[in-house]
């Protein structure tokens, strides 16, 4: 057995393990039982000098017996891994990069990293641009997808913050305008901003707002909003009418600013209104564009004119290549030529229609288009257009449109009728036309279209992984026809994997056969389908070139060539994936096409040179500049010399040193991490904050103020290097020792096994019985039945008298048959009895007589030997014990005296009939035969045969040959030899009696009537002994073994509580120590070796205690360790709450002895220490076998019991005391709840004066959430993402508050479920808690509370993910409300589980759930650790979603692993399948070289870098699907999702044929979980 020793910690070798919880790892070692003579070992609370406990791991188990089938599957799995190493390495890289992206980490592709090259993060450009925009009007020229909108959002937040400060000073109100060029962009930008900024905001475009042209409207807009997103035309009109003035605007943001030219509304706003305003009253300007050029003009001239017109300066990247770390240019650019189509390709159908309806206005544009399309697209496309045109709208609508067109010109009725008739004839003509199926035939399709199909076929066939393609066309009809063409069977057969859709603008054209407008919601729905892969090919018009947020693609095709440089740049910018291709289609021999490409390339070169020629102060350097020059003045000033080695750290060298250190941090393959530098302007110059990646032990540092940005950057790096050196993360040679200096025990195997078992001593009797000796006074406890009638005969309470008063013991049920039970109340009687010799002697005789007559145990003992005494009570079960003044008045002294004076009741054969009623009769020769008499039978004599149906006695003589089966022989149980010496009176009375059941265990709730029903019989009393103990007392004495067993179990549990200093409620104390099966901890498994009649086991209390333990230790760590990061917090908490710690501490205390693991034993309930003269001896075994994990679980159950005990008084103190006793660590020495806040020291950042924006945020939250913050800065910190520089508001990120809030929310959810569902088992509670605390729900809750608008982040990917998620959940909510209305309910009665079905769940923006938990942590801290505010939050905002918990009954079962298990077991009925998970070797995931891209040895960083685990589904020895992830849990989940996708649509027959399944169809039992033997193969991982 593992014990604590003072050994250095040695990381364990990789062994088979499975994840067993948030903090623990469960060892799948062999289930073996080891006898340990030293039950506690040397498990002392050993701490090293640094306060970290040192434990050895469990000893290596004996080899586990594995079936031949599993060995074969394991060998097949390992062989498959060896054969597919390259595939697995590629999958792992993809998984790592995707995981980083989902987490909001801007992962940089790895490049050659050396000490001379300092990587500049793309965020630095954004920060620098933001800082510049704060100082002056700026035009941001950055590539498509580089986060320009993020900069706009940051600037809006900064401007509004300043605006709030100005209003407090009494200045007039002003608002910001975000101007766009297209209506669709109004909706998109407003949607993005409202989802990421918590300010009132309006969207305006001419077609959606009535009354926009009025002074009243604009007055209201000005008063109620901080931002207006609108088309430029609307603002221009409002300014023209003076409904709003330029001095009422504080910020103008021009999206796609290159449109500012000539008479464009952008230009009119500047020329007509901005210029006329006084300089100091003008708003700030921010222009956003990918290129300042939008026409066929000299780029230098166009850029200069744009700067002049917008009164701004262009700012662009000095090193555009740096931005390509995140903005990937196409890997390949191709130009593909096609042959010009014949100009005279007009089709016969087109000519017929032109002749018939060519004169009508309705058909002019369609005819022009089809004439052109016949040449450019092919004859099939031209004719297909008419088929769609007349199919799309019925004849009645076409006739109506014709009539409307003629009404405009006041045509005569005859003309109108003629035109309508022509339309009808055209419709008939098209319907009668024979349309040929599409084919790749030059007579049907143009060379251009055939070339497009070939390109698509080539790209989709050769591509690996998901393909995303955008094809740019000039006209919407072209887009629609091409998309339709790809759905034709012949064409689809060439590209079966393609799923095409059209993305066009919101306008309409007369030539379009689709006349309905496409709104922003429809566009967004198409884009989301494109992102999810439901669509993988978009035919798009110019709407997709700029503005719309379209996911990255790997194939971009210009079917119709661009006209301007900006179109070229923007369409090419859509190809941002690393493997992307940009393909331009040009006509062979077309000089104009060739020259257009050359002009675009030339203009791009000129533009680049123009940007390069900009003054240095106009370039975004990312804080990377000529540091040699800047640092000459610093020489000899700030540097640090390591005393031991003489190594010197200077300002310049600190950048290199920090970069090299960062390179050693764990990171996804093929990527590099880099420090993030954030420079802000402060009084006296510039100050920089450096923020390290999450894996760094020190997260950030702030440098001193300097006059230049470059030196400020060095200063920050210098400070962080000093901090790393001080903490020991840099060695004396300034080299990283990071892998050796991570938090100790981070990878320790801190779980204990549920299979590894050991034998321990077991306490059978409580400490109370150890007090023996002379009796001076006695305390009484009455055992009373609440429903005595269920016993089946008359009874009365029994008194137990002891030398010390029994503590209050919980009531419990006794079972007397089917549906017959009664609770036993253990009533302590006030006062005591002064014990005189006579009373003591009578009690002793009665007690020993009861043991002898009722239980056939004759003891040699005196009063000094007995731990307790029994006495009948003078009174019934209904006695009001409040009237009892002293135990002496309740003792039936008369009965005691009679029993004491009479060994048996005298019998003369002459007694009257009433003598034979209700006597307790004992067979002195057979201890199993005891009877209750009913009455005398005058109609029977001893020699009469025993009537039929009477149960035969068990003695040998009755079964012998020649024995007469009469009443006399039935009554005589002597052996054959002795029977001859006995002569019985032949005419003595026969008595009808009942043979009493030998059952002693009435705690078993499975008892049936036949198990305990007395058996009718007929006796003579001469061979018997009539006991002096009254029958009603005997009836209660028969229950006494069960009663005393439960009472002693309770007293033993209370002894353990006393040992810990805990005053627990007795029933909860017993429940916490009750283990009724070998696998009590496996809630969803069938119980092994189940012990009946033990009452409630510890499972529910453990579930509750686990959460409280997590909460209590979390609060302690948050309070006591304010200067560490979230990672260190998790490690610290893990060391406190891990099962290994609880197990070791329990052994040290000796709790294993007190655990109740055995049910009632009829041999062990008797008092100890008595000499047995007659009767079967007691079972001497006093040891039990316990799993290590069971002992740890009891510790958590004790905490749960303490929590419930304390809650009766509304106090946490008892539970806090229990936590302290269980964890035994200096980081948790609190003994009352008040101790937490008593040692909490408010950090300076919390108590500093809040600015106006922070106060405004607190005010809004007070109105919205119902809690008013005393410290608004605490609220703001709860929404500050780690990517947001702390320098901006001098606040930390939300990570520490999230760590705290997570535990608080978990506790309040568990507490609610525990109380709401008192009969629910832990498995049910756990599954439903999963729904309540899942990220999936918390993201939904965050949306409902509007938290998504408040997150401050510098990551464009996070903002994008938030916007996409909010769009999706808004649609899901709207759908749920509509479903409620359709069902006859109100919209507010929608089903609250709508969030479960959101498809975005696989890529949830985790920051949304994080800020919910951080907010909970913030209100808890702000309220001075008032837990009620957390409960109020839960009741107000969470409970409405869970009023009907049955909505979430299947939430846990929807886990993909469980789903696959059920599918294999029940649908396919396959028994030969197995799910494996195995950690991959480093050389598999990192490449055979064994080193990462930055030179760090992979093995060195593997100590903290999450292991690379492959999970695979094997069916009949064949690998069907696989997935790679950072842990076994995630790998299994990913693998299961792939398996579901593969198997869901597969029939049983197809499954058996494809996978070679020949199982006989016996379904496996899978119920809400996964069979361990079949799913948990080899899993390797770490404890963290």
Swiss-Prot record:
Mg(2+) binds at residues 1298, 1410, 1413. ATP binds at residues 142-149. One of its GO terms (cellular component) is cytoplasm. Residues 448-621 form the Helicase C-terminal domain. Its cofactor is Mg(2+); Mn(2+). Residues 129-310 form the Helicase ATP-binding domain. Zn(2+) binds at residues 1470, 1516, 1557, 1559. Belongs to the helicase family. Dicer subfamily. This is Dicer-like protein 1.
